[in-house]
């Protein structure tokens, strides 16, 4: 998948900002004490009123009270290159670990752009920056003046092979196809040699401007290589085209593997087997999807909910690799042109990796990489620092109750720069609960990461808690909530990045800039529901 240059011209935040500012102010939320029926304990701060209810602007544009300095940390969980951004990821595992090739994107791309760079890891919290792998073409006459997504494999001949997209915006003016499939080889996965004679273009009934993202693998049953390509068929629309080869040089066109006749393109296709099912991942319109089948030949069908993370470039172009017996889904979370919580995500940003979980019915879920339990080893579970609204604590369970015009909140002090928050949450009716971020005791200006039982979703909009019922989310993902049912939550934060996992089923990858820019306190909240938060634990990495 290629980033189009028009992305550099987009500015996103106006509509959501206006929506945040234009709602009627709800009644003031009242203060309450937080009795503990098991023991009399100090809560570390006096209860304070939920102030700031006259504020109508979004949280990140409101004035922060009691601002405290936040000291950031290096990105160890969600890497990106210095002075650049991570674009489409092309994962491949070998005896040296998980090799994470990616499109290297900058804000100052020249005529040529998107070389392939690489990170590598064996534990998902220590990444080695291996630098440049394949450079784009050196002249406007070369088909890979820009490079698009591809794949890397260690083939039957013992060599490493990279198939990638050649993209040249000037070619259509010369009567040539804009995109093609190109081939490079390496003996050591360090030095690469391009093979120009292996370059090939789209078949006649496929668009020459949309022929990209080659994915190559060895099919043991057929004793040949399969090549999947994101293509646009003149009759079927977006398809996953299929080719076969015995030598990785000459390719034979076969019938499409998947043609749902829904999207214009099915970018970044990725096919693998897990258990009794085959899974096909693809991306379009800022979202990563998957389909599944009992056979590698299909037919592939979308499950009822085939999105594992959020919308809007918060997790895109994801492809998979198996490493040490587990399958990982590797994509990127977009950056924003301005660090505003209400702003939209742009193309390319930070690498995000989820571990895939197979459910009993064959559908997939996601969780954090299991190895992170070796990273978050120090308990830093905090005490309550303050509350607002109807909050009670009983034997380690926080019960928050609020009406439609109220917010209940328990605040736990300053967040850790890198932290794992784990708990279970239940909601008794169709309302809102979740995790709040703000400046000290200025609770009226807190913003929230929302578990939305009314609309069956998890989302973030960057506005004050009293506005969450009225504002369109910046990003969201579907999740069905049942009244009274407990859900297991893990929230991993590293600087402004916050990735929430729920029940090993869904993730929402997100950037909460306000949580590192003055509003560095965190808490839990409820609105128009009674919510119970149990077994809250916070862990951080060991000091280095």
Question: Which sequence ranges carry the predicted segments?
Answer:
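Beta-rich carbohydrate-recognition and catalytic domains
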Residues: 21-23, 27, 47, 52-213, ...
């Amino acid at each position: 998948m290629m980033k189009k240059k028009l992305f550099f011209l987009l500015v996103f935040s106006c509509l959501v900002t206006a929506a945040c500012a234009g709602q009627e102010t709800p009644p003031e939320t009242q203060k309450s004490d937080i009795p503990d029926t098991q023991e009399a304990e100090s809560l570390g701060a006096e209860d304070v009123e939920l102030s700031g209810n006259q504020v109508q602007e979004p949280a990140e544009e409101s004035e922060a009270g009691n601002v405290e300095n936040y000291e950031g940390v290096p990105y160890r969980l969600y890497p990106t290159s210095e002075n650049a951004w991570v674009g489409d990821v092309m994962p491949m595992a070998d005896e040296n670990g998980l090799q994470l090739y990616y499109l290297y994107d900058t804000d100052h791309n020249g005529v040529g752009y998107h070389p392939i760079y690489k990170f590598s890891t064996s534990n998902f919290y220590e990444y080695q920056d291996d630098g440049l792998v394949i450079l784009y073409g050196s002249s406007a006459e070369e088909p890979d003046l820009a490079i698009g997504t591809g794949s890397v494999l260690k083939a039957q001949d013992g060599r490493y092979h990279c198939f990638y997209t050649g993209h040249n915006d000037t070619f259509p003016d010369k009567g040539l196809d804009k995109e093609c499939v190109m081939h490079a080889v390496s003996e050591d996965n360090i030095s690469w040699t391009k093979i120009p004679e292996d370059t090939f273009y789209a078949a006649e009934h496929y668009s020459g401007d949309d022929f990209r993202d080659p994915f190559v693998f060895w099919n043991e049953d057929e004793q040949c290589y399969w090549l999947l390509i994101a293509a646009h068929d003149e009759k079927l629309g977006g398809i996953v085209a299929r080719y076969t080869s015995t030598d990785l040089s000459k390719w034979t066109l076969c019938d499409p593997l998947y043609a749902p006749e829904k999207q214009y393109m099915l970018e970044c296709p990725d096919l693998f087997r897990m258990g009794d099912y085959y899974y096909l991942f693809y991306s379009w319109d800022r979202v990563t999807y998957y389909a599944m089948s009992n056979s590698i030949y299909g037919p592939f069908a979308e499950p009822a909910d085939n999105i594992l993370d959020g919308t809007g470039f918060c997790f895109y172009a994801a492809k998979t690799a198996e490493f040490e017996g587990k399958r990982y889904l590797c994509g990127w979370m977009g950056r924003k042109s301005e660090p505003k919580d209400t702003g939209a995500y742009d193309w390319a940003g930070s690498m995000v990796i989820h571990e895939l979980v197979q459910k009993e019915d064959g559908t997939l879920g996601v969780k954090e990489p299991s190895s992170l339990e070796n990273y978050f080893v120090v308990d830093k579970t905090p005490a309550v620092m303050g509350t607002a609204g109807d909050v009670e604590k009983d034997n380690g369970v926080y019960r928050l109750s609020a009406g439609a015009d109220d917010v209940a909140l328990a605040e736990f002090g300053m967040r850790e720069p890198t932290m794992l928050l784990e708990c279970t949450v239940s909601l008794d009716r169709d309302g809102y609960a979740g995790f709040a971020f703000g400046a000290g005791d200025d609770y009226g200006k807190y913003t929230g990461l929302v578990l939305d039982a009314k609309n069956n979703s998890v989302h973030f909009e960057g506005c004050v808690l009293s506005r969450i019922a009225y504002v369109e989310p910046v990003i969201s993902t579907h999740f069905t909530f049942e009244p009274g049912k407990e859900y297991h939550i893990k929230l991993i934060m590293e600087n402004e990045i916050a990735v929430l996992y729920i029940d090993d089923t869904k993730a929402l990858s997100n950037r909460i800039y306000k949580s590192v820019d003055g509003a560095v306190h965190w808490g839990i909240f409820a609105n128009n529901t009674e919510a119970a938060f149990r077994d809250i634990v916070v862990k951080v990495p060991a000091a280095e």
